């Protein structure tokens, strides 16, 4: 209760301060972005849809009735009326335009999202909170040169390996899992053949690690980072989304659980998406305190979760100067603002360029 009161107070203070700063000059503040070229790839951006325009997407009633639903529509810059009129595909158009407007981010990986799979190896719509099919993301990303396709395949599907092969043929750059809402146990030996095929195809796995609070409910025990020991030991290149920030497993902080894994497995990386959210205060500082993470960090935004009150430079005045917070808050482009905030908090340029270097060299 005390923490909630403190967060509400912090948000209120930032609202007042932001109103004052809204009167200030709204410059682009390119000097906050120390990159000579537009080369950064964002490896972690979500889309969603309601099936408009025959997208095949859906959000179940539980999630649509959740308070988060309206916030997510707002964060994606859309509305029910617009989706119905333009189709779900309008979200891709908006993302592409925003990335094109960025001074430093060149491309964004758009994540498909598979659902829960039943005992027959088929999609369980009743258990699935959100579904974004591979085919839809593939077709839409083909239309925009600055959007990259990421597949999502629940390995419990009866045709999971066939889907993986197809995803590779269609140019997917990785496979995305959120085990805690897809009900995948990454440590389940049953899915070893799927992992072996991933290695054969050189297909990386981007898997959520740590507590999940973006959905109506989640089985957080499935996002224990140590469950990734199995794919890592088999040679799968794994990107631990959010570097297991937040949550505990077996009485230990998830972040502490992943640190020895970084030393143990050279094929383990962590993405820096969501690290500046209000529920993760201090985690950038924690990351910087561990030299073993240097050279293992990959840039991601967790778009659309970049909006106030989830993220603000004013939450991080222990790591930013007031002048830096003012300058960052003036940046209009979401991607540029995200990069500037993370740079300002101490993350070095390598964390923003490693992903595209590895992707280009096929090391991912």
What are these model-predicted stretches?
Residues 114-220, 284:
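Active-site gating/metal-coordination segments in enzymes
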Residues 41-45, 108-110, 149-151, 175-177, ...:
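Hydrophobic faces of well-ordered beta-strands that scaffold small-molecule active sites
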Residues 158-168, 186-191, 216-232, 248-262, ...:
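Distinct, well-ordered alpha-helical segments
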Residues 22-111, 117-128, 338, 349-351, ...:
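An N-terminally biased module of ancient metal coordination in phosphate/nucleic-acid-related enzymes
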Residues 46, 113, 152-156, 178-182, ...:
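Active-site beta-loop-alpha junctions enriched in small/polar residues
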Residues 25, 245-364:
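H/E-rich (His + Asp/Glu) clusters that bind or coordinate divalent metals
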Residues 37-39, 104-107, 143-148, 170-173, ...:
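Short, well-ordered coil/turn segments that N-cap beta-strands
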Residues 11-19:
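Bacterial N-terminal signal peptides
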